[in-house]
């Protein structure tokens, strides 16, 4: 493969999946996704592509379809810079959340990420509970989480904030940045070696697009002012896009989120809150809910001032959220199975009737 392909992130993990390419296809990486339209990069340049009907039909869920960062098989149309995506290669990592809306389904936001920059602003956006939520998502993705505390120039409690965040994120790296200063943002380049793909995850207005623009050295993504009345930013990134740095590495910008709803992070929540999990082992009752039960080591730690009650509430809230989604998924699966059995029975009855004629 070409040096460009290696810089894009192609490696032995993906090569092993296609030792023999299907005739007329070539590997490519998804750079941009706009609804059902994609821009992909192959060894000979960029193509505009759509998903074949067969791939869409065979995909078990929306999460199985291509997203930015995916490696896919492309069937180009001869003589044109367009083609069809016929397959999605197995993902090495994936950043997922529960899709917005009432339906309980997985939404993959980006695939094959090596480093996930979790960005929060040191302004009205600063929220330890949100960082906990993002960290659980990062751990589940299998990407390396890196905490970025942006807008350090607007903060008067930087050292205090770093100490608070350290207590929450454990050993994950923490960096403070001023997105408008290329020198300040330069510390993030250490994570962006050739072939490495990094994504930025954070709520609206934390400065993700400005950080990427500083790393690129020019304004690739639009930025907007944060509203002073609420501290919230407007969505300036309307789609996900992968860009290649001239110095090596790849960056993915994602639209800002009002809320990140967790998806399948049961074990990861335990890892994020390992201090509470360790205390829970000392509770008198194995099924202790850390509420009013006697002999609760967790409540004792709160009462002694050793455990932040807000952290305990965050832990309990995330567990309730996961339990709700788990039950919703089970109910939906049962209804789907029941519907499938009914259809099979109707087909069976029709077959029997035809044979009796």
Where are the model-predicted features located?
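A conserved segment at the C-terminal end of the G1
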Residues: 208-224
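Structural beta-sheet core signal
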Residues: 118, 147-149
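Helix-rich effector regions associated with P-loop NTPase G domains
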Residues: 3-4, 24, 54, 60-71, ...
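Canonical P-loop GTPase G-domain recognition
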Residues: 144, 151-206
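N-terminal accessory targeting/assembly segments
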Residues: 1-128
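Histidine-anchored nucleotide/phosphate-binding helix
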Residues: 129-139
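General small-molecule cofactor/ligand-binding pocket signal
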Residues: 86, 175, 252
């Amino acid at each position: 493969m070409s040096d460009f392909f290696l810089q894009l992130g192609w490696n032995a993990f993906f090569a092993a999946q296609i030792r023999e390419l299907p005739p007329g296809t070539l590997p490519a990486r998804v750079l941009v996704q706009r609804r059902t339209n994609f821009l992909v990069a192959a060894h000979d340049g960029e193509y505009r592509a759509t998903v074949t009907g067969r791939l869409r039909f065979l995909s078990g869920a929306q999460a199985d379809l291509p997203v930015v960062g995916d490696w896919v098989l492309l069937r180009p149309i001869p003589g044109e810079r367009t083609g069809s995506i016929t397959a999605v290669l197995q993902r090495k990592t994936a950043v997922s959340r529960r899709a917005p809306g009432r339906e309980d389904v997985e939404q993959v936001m980006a695939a094959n990420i090596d480093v996930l920059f979790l960005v929060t602003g040191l302004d009205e956006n600063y929220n330890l509970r949100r960082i906990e939520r993002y960290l659980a998502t990062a751990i589940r993705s299998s990407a390396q989480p890196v905490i970025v505390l942006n807008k350090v120039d607007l903060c008067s409690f930087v050292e205090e904030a770093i100490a608070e965040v350290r207590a929450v994120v454990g050993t994950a790296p923490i960096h403070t940045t001023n997105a408008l200063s290329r020198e300040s943002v330069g510390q993030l380049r250490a994570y962006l070696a050739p072939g490495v793909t990094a994504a930025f995850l954070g709520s609206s207005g934390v400065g993700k697009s400005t950080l990427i623009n500083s790393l690129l050295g020019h304004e690739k993504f639009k930025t907007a002012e944060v509203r002073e009345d609420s501290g919230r930013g407007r969505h300036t990134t309307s789609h996900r896009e992968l860009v290649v740095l001239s110095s090596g590495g790849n960056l993915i910008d994602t639209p800002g989120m009002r809320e990140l709803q967790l998806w399948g992070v049961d074990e990861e929540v335990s890892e994020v809150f390992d201090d509470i999990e360790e205390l829970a082992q000392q509770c008198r009752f194995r099924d202790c809910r850390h509420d009013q039960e006697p002999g609760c080591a967790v409540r004792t730690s709160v009462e002694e001032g050793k455990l932040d009650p807000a952290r305990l509430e965050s832990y309990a809230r995330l567990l309730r959220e996961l339990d709700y989604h788990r039950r919703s998924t089970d109910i939906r699966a049962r209804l789907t199975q029941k519907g499938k059995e009914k259809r099979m029975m109707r087909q069976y009855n029709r077959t029997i009737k035809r044979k009796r004629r």
